[in-house]
Swiss-Prot record:
Subunit field text: Part of the 50S ribosomal subunit; part of the 5S rRNA/L5/L18/L25 subcomplex. Contacts the 5S rRNA and the P site tRNA. Forms a bridge to the 30S subunit in the 70S ribosome.
Family: Belongs to the universal ribosomal protein uL5 family.
GO cellular component term of the entry, any: ribonucleoprotein complex
Molecular function in Gene Ontology: rRNA binding; structural constituent of ribosome; tRNA binding
Entry keywords, A to Z: Ribonucleoprotein, Ribosomal protein, RNA-binding, rRNA-binding, tRNA-binding
Biological source species: Synechococcus sp. (strain CC9311)
Highest taxon listed in the record's lineage: Bacteria
Gene Ontology BP, a term: translation
Functional note: This is one of the proteins that bind and probably mediate the attachment of the 5S RNA into the large ribosomal subunit, where it forms part of the central protuberance. In the 70S ribosome it contacts protein S13 of the 30S subunit (bridge B1b), connecting the 2 subunits; this bridge is implicated in subunit movement. Contacts the P site tRNA; the 5S rRNA and some of its associated proteins might help stabilize positioning of ribosome-bound tRNAs.
Protein name: Large ribosomal subunit protein uL5
InterPro entries in UniProt: Ribosomal_uL5, Ribosomal_uL5_bac-type, Ribosomal_uL5_C, Ribosomal_uL5_CS, Ribosomal_uL5_dom_sf, Ribosomal_uL5_N
A Pfam family that the UniProt record links to this protein: Ribosomal_L5
Extent of the signal sequence: none
C-alpha cells in the first residue's frame, strides 16, 4: 500500500479522531516537500553545481532549479546572480513516493541513526531535517559521487501547530527520537 493510499484510508480517519476534529478537511496533510542544497563552492567550482543538480534529479525524479545569489557578498566572493545552490519542490504523487523512500529506505541507512529530532518544527507544523550525506539514498551510487554533500529536506504541512504536524508525520512513519 502506497503512502498516499495509507494516508487516505488509515492515517486521515485516525488523526480526525485523535486530534478531535469535526471535519475530514481539517485533518493536517502534507502540502509539499522541498529538497534544497546550498553550495558555497559553486562560486568557484562549476562541476560541483552540475554534480549536485544531477544527484538531486536522481533522488527526486524531477527537474532541479538552480538558486542564484540575490546580492553580491564580497566576503564570500559572490556576485549577484551567481549560482549558489539548487532546489526541488515536490507535490502530489512524486511527493508521497519521495517521502516513502526517505522514511523507509534513506533514514535507516544513516550511520548511528537513533531517530530524527522532534524539535525541528518551525512553529506552524512544518518540519525540516538536514541530511549530512547524499549516499543514504539508494539512487546514488557511492562510486559515482565526487564529494559527500548534504541537503535540507522541508516537509510543509497544512497543520496549524507543531503538535498536529508531529502527529501527522509520526503516523506516516517518521522515526522521531525519544528524548
Amino acid at each position: 500500500m502506497s503512502l498516499k493510499q495509507r494516508y487516505r484510508e488509515t492515517i486521515q480517519p485516525k488523526l480526525l479522531k485523535d486530534l478531535s476534529l469535526s471535519n475530514i478537511h481539517e485533518v493536517p496533510k502534507v502540502l509539499k516537500v522541498t529538497v534544497n542544497r546550498g553550495l558555497g563552492e559553486a562560486a568557484t567550482n562549476a562541476k560541483s553545481l552540475e554534480a549536485s543538480v544531477n544527484e538531486l534529479a536522481q533522488i527526486t525524479g524531477q527537474k532541479v532549479v538552480i538558486t542564484r545569489a540575490k546580492k553580491a557578498i564580497a566576503a564570500f566572493k559572490i556576485r549577484q546572480g551567481m549560482p549558489i545552490g539548487c532546489a526541488v519542490t515536490l507535490r502530489g504523487d512524486r511527493m508521497y513516493a519521495f517521502l516513502e523512500r526517505f522514511i523507509n529506505l534513506a533514514l535507516p541507512r544513516i550511520r548511528d541513526f537513533r531517530g530524527v529530532s522532534p524539535k525541528s518544527f518551525d512553529g506552524r507544523g512544518n518540519y525540516t531535517v538536514g541530511v549530512r550525506e547524499q549516499i543514504i539514498f539508494p539512487e546514488i551510487s557511492f562510486d559515482k559521487i565526487d564529494a559527500i554533500r548534504g541537503m535540507d529536506i522541508t516537509i510543509v504541512t497544512s497543520a496549524r501547530t507543531d503538535e498536529e504536524g508531529r502527529a501527522l508525520l509520526r503516523e506516516m512513519g517518521m522515526p522521531f527520537r525519544s528524548n
